[in-house]
């Protein structure tokens, strides 16, 4: 079924297709429509929506529902996610599945409500305390806002871990075609949940391990599942990279601008390609390294002062030059702006 839909609303429709049965959150621009849509749609299928008194309360409600075996989610933006970080660390430490949507806005501090990509470090590098990882998915369209949210629930259950849908505010606020295909949600049986089973006692779920050896073993087990995710879950998209001399790298709304840059640059005689990471963690390092090595030059474009570029440089490992171009404050570089940047940089290397 095709419909015109806002990105934030598409998140909730994707969650419903995944069998989400609880949403706890607190409204914040530019993510508020997710809570509004959840309040409208979840009760219609017998699911729970609750607006908490704060983001701290919301993430701890998510912890409780996840421990009970419910497919549960929350959504927020910048400052709200900062308040949730302790709870996210607890959820990861207790190995509980949940989905968290971050519709990024400008920062630091209160910043503004305009879109940015400045939460990359906070979400991709963990954000909270301790040795844990978030699986992070980066949609670039309204369609992917729905599809990657559905996928997020499956990955959360597969790895018993928080999964972040990291969207810039442009993708959250834009409206475009959404093609929804009904699927029967089949969440796995959760024998580990606090309710246990008729044949077993109830389970105790916690993230505290008082004995050093117990905590170390717990962290080894967590690292083993993260290693499995690195091997099985990297996702990315390449566009016209086979003969490219310059490789553009961007995610979210930036990747859509860069696709147009590729076409415009090629009309001007520059062989340019695009690499779009879809999983920001696990980062598609091997595929990016191969594409970058073929090209010889890399330009990373972000709506930040340079965050993902650090992972790009780690992936390339000094094999080729990696340069950066960024805009902040809610400004998105135009196709003409990036093409001019490419032309200027190409002239400097002649």
Where are these regions (language model features)?
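Glycine-/acidic-rich phosphate or pyrophosphate-binding loops and their flanking alpha/beta elements
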Residues: 6-10, 223-246, 259
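Glycine-rich beta-alpha junction loops
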Residues: 105-107, 167-174, 252-254, 305, ...
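Peripheral docking tails and interdomain loops at the edges
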Residues: 302-350
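Conserved thiamine diphosphate
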Residues: 114-168
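Thiamine diphosphate
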Residues: 1-126, 133, 141, 328, ...
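Conformationally flexible catalytic loops at phosphate/diphosphate-handling active centers
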Residues: 160-238
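Generic long, charged, amphipathic alpha-helical segments
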Residues: 258-291
């Amino acid at each position: 079924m095709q419909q015109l839909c806002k990105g934030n609303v598409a998140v909730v429709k994707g969650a419903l297709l995944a069998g989400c049965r609880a949403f706890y959150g607190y409204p914040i621009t530019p993510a508020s429509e997710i809570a509004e849509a959840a309040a409208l749609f979840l009760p219609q299928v017998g699911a729970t929506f609750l607006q908490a008194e704060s983001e701290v309360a919301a993430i701890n409600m998510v912890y409780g529902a996840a421990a009970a075996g419910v497919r549960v989610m929350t959504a927020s933006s910048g400052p709200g996610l900062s308040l949730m970080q302790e709870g996210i660390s607890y959820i990861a430490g207790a190995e509980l599945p949940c989905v968290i949507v971050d519709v990024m806005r400008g920062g630091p501090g209160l910043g503004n409500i305009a879109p940015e990509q400045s939460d990359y470090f906070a979400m991709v590098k963990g954000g909270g305390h301790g040795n844990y990882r978030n699986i992070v998915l980066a949609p670039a369209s309204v369609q992917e806002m729905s599809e990657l949210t559905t996928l997020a629930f499956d990955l959360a259950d597969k790895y018993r871990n928080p999964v972040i849908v990291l969207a810039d505010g442009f993708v959250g606020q834009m409206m475009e075609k959404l093609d929804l295909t009904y699927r029967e949600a089949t969440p796995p049986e959760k024998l580990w949940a606090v309710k246990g089973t008729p044949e077993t006692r109830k389970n105790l779920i916690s993230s505290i391990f008082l004995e050093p050896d117990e905590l170390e073993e717990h962290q080894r087990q967590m690292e083993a599942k993260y290693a499995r995710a690195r091997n099985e879950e990297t996702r990315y998209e390449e566009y016209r990279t086979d003969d490219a001399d310059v490789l553009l790298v961007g995610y979210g709304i930036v990747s859509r601008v860069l696709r147009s840059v590729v076409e415009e640059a090629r009309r001007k005689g520059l062989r340019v390609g695009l690499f779009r990471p879809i999983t920001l963690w696990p980062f598609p390092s091997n595929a990016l390294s191969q594409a970058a090595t073929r090209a010889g030059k890399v330009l990373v474009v972000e709506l930040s002062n340079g965050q993902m570029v650090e992972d790009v440089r780690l992936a390339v490992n000094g094999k080729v030059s990696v340069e950066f171009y960024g805009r902040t404050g809610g400004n998105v570089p135009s196709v003409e702006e990036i093409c001019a940047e490419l032309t200027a940089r190409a002239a400097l290397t002649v």
